[in-house]
Amino acid sequence: MAPSGDSNVKEHNNQVSYKKAINTKTDLILQNKKHANDIFDVIEYLQSEKEKEIIFATNACSKIFCELIERGDLFVGELPKEEDLAQGDRSAEEKYHIFMRHRYNSCVELMLENVSHESFQVKETSLCAVMKFVATEGKHPLQNLDWSEHYNFPRELIQALVEHLLSEKEDMSLLISRFQEFMEKDDVRYYVMSSVRYSTATVMERNKKAVIPVFQNNVFNLLTTINIPNQASEMTNFLVQQQSKHDDWKAAKLKEHKRAFEQMWLLFLRYKLPGSMYKKILVILHESILPQMSDPKLMMDFLSAAYDIGGAISLSALNGLFVPIHEHNLDYPDFYKKLYNLLDPSIFHVKYRARFFHLANIFLSSTHLPVYLVAAFVKRLARLSLTAPPTALLILLPFICNLIRRHPSCRVLIHRPSAADEPCDDPYVMEEEDPAQCHALESSLWEIKTLQNHHHPDVSKAATMINEPLSAQEEDISELLELTTFELMERELKGEKKTVPLEFDMATDLLKSSREVLGVHFTLE
């Protein structure tokens, strides 16, 4: 037990030692310029292998340089090289300012490197320290101001921070969520959006537009933390308070924020994305992205690319296309053709089956759709019903009947004479991708007639609906969308039977059935 106690004491002494050393040097640096060289020792702790030493030194450096910036003790303007200090005729004061400015730059570089440290506490401390520098530099600029702009903001520092947050090798989602607090500041948000746009273009072009999953996931996480205010009057929260209000400051204009937001997203979506990311973007598309777009048409290329991926992503992409088409009267002639081609046997066996039929019901709800188009959907669904499981059929049959109710011209598919009774060739072409060329209106719903002999009583009962005139009131299929085979079996097992069948065939006469062995060999006279 003794060695353990000695170890704890030694560790405690080490902690006291480095804290005392850093605090002492911090006080000396701030009290007297002759101790300027002590800054090297404090900065060196930023490269320590011990997490606690880095955190303590980071806070010390933040205190030192924020105070020096506020005092005006750092060189302002284009920084001369340190090698040139001995050559020029500069005062001791000016040399001190240049020296400390170089040390400040070194400190910032190390803090930015620590944003990618393996310890989250180090990352968070470094992030907060850099943002303190952003706020301090905003109030006391280290660059000569361009007075044509009349405002100041350390854009280069924000750009450097964003580049480290958008790592190509490390998932930074946790730190980005911490950074969201700073994104509530209107000026920070604006310059971050500009920086994201620049960093995304630089990295993607450098990698020849190839998919970079980690980097693109970091960009997506940062983009989703950005919330644009609804009204210009809400934009009053700034990290850097300007000396006076300026109408030409873009960071203070809601219109400029929306423009930067739009440009940032469009640039990000221009490149090929990891397959899983399309679904994430499509989920937030309507609530978070489209409302800030000046023209919904700008998203058409992305949505078309998402459709080509297939599966649930294709369906979500069509949903994304439907809103601009429906609400903004945008023309997209291939929309229903693409929806039509999503109808295949696999649709009954995927997890998103309920969502598919829910959205398909919305897409086909308009009574102004051409009759040939609705007939094509009705016929394709009818053909697919021949191989569909009972749970899917209980959705399909009411769905088909609802389509016919909305479009009475499609009743010709039901009432085509003798189509189900006489052998004939079905003119409908199942393999045709264009609903206008599949000849659905020339066919009939013989498939539904066939399902009237289905082994499941609920299915056969639902199929007999087309034998009677359809009511004007549509059936509610919402409760059927999530129906499972287990629920169907439970329903059958719990149901009360009025009669119990004793034979496969109903007995009518004694010993007269040709299927009974006794009836074949014996006859009653």
UniProtKB/Swiss-Prot annotation:
It is a multi-pass membrane protein. GO terms for biological process: ribosome biogenesis. It holds the Pfam family CBF. GO terms for cellular component: Noc4p-Nop14p complex; nuclear membrane; nucleolus; small-subunit processome. The chain crosses the membrane at residues 305-325, 356-376, 384-404. Keywords: Membrane, Nucleus, Transmembrane, Transmembrane helix. InterPro entries: CCAAT-binding_factor, Noc4. Disulfide bonds: none annotated. It is found in: Nucleus membrane; Nucleus, Nucleolus. It comes from the Eukaryota. Belongs to the CBF/MAK21 family. This is Nucleolar complex protein 4 homolog. It comes from Danio rerio (Zebrafish).
